[in-house]
Design a protein with these regions (language model features):
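Conserved glycine-rich cofactor-binding loop
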Residues: 19, 26-27
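Conserved glycine-rich Rossmann-like NAD(P)H-binding loop of the short-chain dehydrogenase/reductase
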Residues: 40-56
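The beta1-alpha1 cofactor-binding region of Rossmann-like NAD(H)/NADP(H)-dependent oxidoreductases
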Residues: 51-52, 72-84, 115
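Substrate-binding pocket helix/loop in short-chain dehydrogenase/reductase
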Residues: 109-110, 117-122
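Active-site helix of classical SDR
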Residues: 133, 169
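Residue(s) in the substrate-gating loop at a strand-loop-helix junction
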Residues: 153
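C-terminal helical subdomain
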Residues: 186-189, 193-194, 201, 209-247
Length: 247
């Protein structure tokens, strides 16, 4: 009985012993997710391109007693991704939770956008998910378990004027996530998607300014934590997150 208790995570830290990698974890939604998973007991790796923001986020995590590995990386580049995964595993251990959060917004009519705009947005919002997931999945297969949580958007469900490029990236992410879930469930790996509406920290600057009518980064982090703490016999395939008050 004592041995069972030793191997059972503390109820306040159900993710104890887990290692989470959060892309774009140096700011905004990603940082909130990293903090929440760390509070629940996970060791956390964060990455981003802004070294200053990365240092600040890492300091916040360390101040809370969270084991952390931070690394500057461009997740649209396969070489950076390979180094990120290898160094995370060397520092913290095998990755058991991957949160594909890195993303960007670019808005306006399709006919006013350039090929470079398209490439930049799709690389950041979609290619990065493919590259990081591909690098992490073999380790999860070896562990026979894992959670991949992709941060999408309600823009992956709804069209709106000026959203052509952004919506395309998020609709594609929905399809990729669904196929990954079917590919990997036989290995004990769960793939989930979180689709928030407007978030107060959102990069686009679109939407209402009234904070009571938008989500907070913490709201998204709470949904991610709920998915990561789900019992082993089930998974939440898709979560739609909306503010209570309509804009």
């Amino acid at each position: 009985m004592d041995r069972i208790q030793e191997n059972t995570p503390h109820p306040d830290q159900p993710l104890s012993g887990k290692v989470a990698l959060v892309t774009g974890g140096n700011r905004g939604i990603g940082k909130a997710i990293a903090l929440r998973l760390g509070e629940l007991g996970a060791a956390v790796a964060i990455c981003g391109r802004d070294s200053s923001a990365l240092r600040k986020a890492s300091a916040e995590l360390l101040a809370l007693g969270i084991r952390v590995h931070s690394q500057q990386a461009d997740v649209t580049r396969a070489g950076d991704v390979a180094g990120l995964v290898a160094q995370t595993e060397a520092a913290l251990g095998p990755i058991s939770i991957l949160v594909n959060n890195a993303g960007m917004g670019l808005f306006g009519p399709v006919h006013e956008k350039s090929e470079a705009d398209w490439d930049t947005l799709l690389d950041t919002n979609l290619k990065s998910v493919f590259l990081v997931s591909r690098a992490v999945i073999p380790g999860m297969i070896e562990q026979k378990s894992g959670d991949i949580i992709n941060i999408s958007s309600l823009a992956g469900k709804n069209a709106f004027a000026g959203g052509g490029l952004y919506c395309a990236s998020k609709w594609a992410l929905q399809g990729l996530s669904g196929c990954m879930a079917e590919d990997l469930r036989g290995f004990g790996i769960r793939v989930s998607t979180v689709c928030p509406g407007s978030v107060a920290t959102e990069f686009s600057g679109r939407g209402p300014k009234d904070p009571s009518k938008v989500l907070s980064a913490g709201d998204v982090a709470h949904a991610v934590a709920m998915i990561a703490c789900q019992g082993p016999q089930s998974f939440l395939s898709e979560v739609h997150l909306r503010p209570v008050r309509k804009a």
